[in-house]
């Protein structure tokens, strides 16, 4: 084999790390290398079909796409060859020498020494071609891009360590041929029956024919036998597809090693005709919060693959959904730009969104434990829904889960339907509090009255919660009410007695004195009976920006208007009584500043001048 332009190049450092981790972590499930390589061949065939729609000459007179397996027991090699799109030299370097995924380095550094966990993570990452090194100590690739001249083939070879060799070679037929030089002890992959078994397990569902070489022992003639069904799984009747086949197809399209939580396979006829196969994964992808994270459905038009990651068919808050849509109503030459503005796309998006929400409703109803697993993985993403999808806001609200004062656990398990179902008699609102952490929410002084009255409060501590609640204003006809905002209904809950009213009258000069002292540092000063153990709190007016929202603005680098608090004092608390008796103005100011700082610290978690607070506290303690 004559080679030109030969050079040795080093792997990207992430590739070396991935190879090392993969070989050691995936060894117990090593047969998946065959699934990964056949899956790549299927993708290469899909890409050729799509490109050939506008350039049929790319078929080069051979439109029968397939992948072929052959082995040589003497040489101990296994070869997987396809006649798909193929690669040129630049594509080989990009696809086999680097990992073009942002966040890869951080992901690989996060992997520890737990092999079971590592294999899940690496599998989820999508090992693809590199899985060949699980069973091979050397891998040779010969490829030629469809439409390129025969002398524009590319040779690539590596032993899976620091570098690889690349060169230009001649290759008559297009496509990619991967030869695995098997490690000692891997002879099982030189057995036709073993290969049939693995392919039957992992690749029966793909539309690309998988053929295995058979030799006539008498005359040495070679024939190719198809060993998979080679019918696109989604085109088959649901009754003819087993759960195992659905699971394996998910792993094929999602490059995930774990079984999905649930799936929905539907064929729709009428105004629009399409087939959809949608999956809810069991775990979040490692890069779900990465800005460059690829998501979306595979798009087929009349069973012809058009594109991966068609984001237009699913709202962003459902970006974890995997699967495909096969439409009869879109043109074969559809582009991402056309999809963006297409009425067909908008209708499909609406229908598929409702389908996924129905899947989640069913999961929540039929399998509470399964839904809790889903919520732990994807709850934060689903919380984006009320802001993004006004049409389905009520349905999304039913799917939300919260921690609450009803439980001692931080687990988010309470649905809004459950909360409403056990509301206290006469309770008209759904009460909640937002905070930086579950502990801060649970210990907030704002909850004292509710504990006393036995009223449940939802405890919200995810960063997105405050933003979500600005869009989620009511559920089942009942408005949401933050317990840290001013509200007449909360004052009514306090059940103020005549005795308390009289005491308040006597304290009016004290309140006026506090107002004069604090001036415009606060919006107002008032007495409250919402507290039992705490001397003072700060709250915001109903129309004022909340503390948590101001923190969100700050975290995003945006300037938020200063929050003006209402300062509420508990007239029955010993510290407030003591402060009201102080005649000396300087000492009075120390007491009020201390009470205000305590209230601000409880509300915000920080103070502008903590040293001054400590100094003041020490001074009053030693007085």
Swiss-Prot record:
Record localization: Cytoplasm
Annotated GO CC locations: cytoplasm
Region annotation A: where it falls in the sequence: 1-336
InterPro entries: HATPase_C_sf, Heat_shock_protein_90_CS, HSP90_C, Hsp90_fam, Hsp90_N, Ribosomal_Su5_D2-typ_SF
Main localization of the protein described in the UniProt heading: cytoplasm
UniProt-annotated stretches for the region B: 337-551
Span list, region C: 552-623
Family membership: Belongs to the heat shock protein 90 family.
Keywords per UniProt: ATP-binding, Chaperone, Cytoplasm, Nucleotide-binding, Stress response
Nucleotide-binding keyword on record: yes
An example Gene Ontology molecular-function term: ATP hydrolysis activity
Function: Molecular chaperone. Has ATPase activity.
Subunit and interaction comment: Homodimer.
Pfam families in UniProt: HATPase_c_3 (PF13589), HSP90 (PF00183)
The protein, known as: Chaperone protein HtpG
Species the sequence originates in: Serratia proteamaculans (strain 568)
């Amino acid at each position: 084999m004559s080679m030109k332009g030969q050079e040795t190049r080093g792997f990207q450092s992430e590739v070396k790390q991935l190879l090392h981790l993969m070989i050691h972590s995936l060894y117990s499930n090593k047969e998946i290398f065959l699934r990964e390589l056949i899956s790549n061949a299927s993708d290469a065939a899909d890409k050729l079909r799509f490109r050939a729609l506008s350039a049929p000459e790319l078929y080069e007179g051979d439109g029968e796409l397939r992948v072929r397996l052959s082995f040589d027991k003497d040489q101990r090699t296994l070869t997987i060859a396809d006649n798909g799109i193929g690669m040129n030299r630049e594509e080989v370097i990009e696809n086999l020498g680097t990992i073009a995924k942002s966040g890869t380095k951080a992901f690989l550094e996060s992997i520890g020494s737990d092999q079971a966990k590592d294999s899940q993570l690496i599998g989820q990452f999508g090992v693809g071609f590199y899985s060949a090194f699980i069973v091979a100590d050397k891998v040779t690739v010969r490829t030629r891009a469809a439409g390129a001249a025969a002398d524009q083939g590319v040779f690539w070879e590596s032993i899976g360590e620091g570098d690889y060799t690349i060169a230009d070679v001649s290759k008559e037929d297009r496509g990619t041929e991967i030869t695995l030089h098997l490690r000692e002890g891997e002879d099982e992959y030189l057995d036709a029956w073993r290969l049939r078994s693995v392919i039957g397990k992992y690749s029966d569902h793909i539309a690309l024919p998988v053929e295995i070489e058979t030799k006539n022992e008498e005359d040495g003639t070679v024939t190719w036998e198809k060993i998979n069904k080679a019918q696109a799984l989604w085109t088959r009747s649901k009754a003819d597809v087993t759960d195992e086949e659905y699971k394996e197809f998910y792993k094929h399209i999602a490059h995930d090693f774990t079984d999905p939580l649930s799936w929905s396979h539907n064929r729709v006829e009428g105004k629009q005709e399409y087939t959809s196969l949608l999956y809810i994964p069991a775990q979040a992808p490692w890069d779900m919060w990465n800005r460059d994270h690829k998501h979306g459905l595979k798009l087929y038009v009349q069973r012809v693959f058009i594109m991966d990651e068609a984001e237009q068919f699913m709202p962003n808050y459902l970006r974890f959904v995997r699967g495909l849509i096969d439409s009869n109503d879109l043109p074969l030459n559809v582009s991402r730009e056309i999809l963006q503005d297409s009425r067909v796309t908008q209708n499909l998006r609406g229908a598929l969104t409702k389908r996924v929400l129905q899947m989640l409703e069913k999961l929540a109803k039929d399998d509470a434990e399964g839904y809790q697993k889903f919520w732990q993985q994807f709850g934060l993403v689903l919380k984006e829904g009320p802001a993004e999808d006004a049409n389905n806001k009520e349905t999304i609200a039913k799917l939300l889960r919260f921690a609450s004062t009803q439980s001692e656990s931080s687990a988010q398990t309470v649905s809004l339907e459950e909360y409403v179902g056990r509301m206290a008699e006469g309770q008209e609102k759904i009460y909640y509090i937002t905070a930086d952490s579950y502990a801060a929410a649970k210990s907030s002084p704002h909850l004292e009255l509710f504990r006393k009255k036995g009223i449940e409060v939802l405890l919200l501590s995810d960063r997105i919660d405050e933003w979500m609640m600005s869009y989620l204003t009511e559920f089942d006809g009942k408005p949401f009410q933050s317990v840290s905002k001013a509200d007449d209904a909360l004052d009514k809950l306090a059940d103020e007695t005549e005795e308390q009213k009289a005491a308040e009258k006597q304290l009016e000069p004290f309140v006026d004195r506090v107002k004069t002292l604090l001036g415009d540092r606060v919006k107002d000063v008032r007495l409250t009976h919402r507290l039992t153990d705490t001397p003072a709190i700060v709250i915001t007016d109903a129309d004022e920006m909340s503390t948590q929202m101001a923190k969100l603005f700050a975290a995003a680098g945006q300037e938020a208007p200063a929050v003006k608090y209402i300062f509420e004092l508990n007239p029955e608390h010993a510290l407030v009584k003591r402060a009201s008796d102080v005649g000396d103005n300087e000492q009075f100011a120390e007491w009020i500043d201390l009470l205000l700082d305590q209230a601000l610290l409880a509300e915000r978690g920080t103070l502008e001048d903590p040293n001054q607070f400590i100094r003041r506290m020490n001074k009053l303690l030693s007085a």
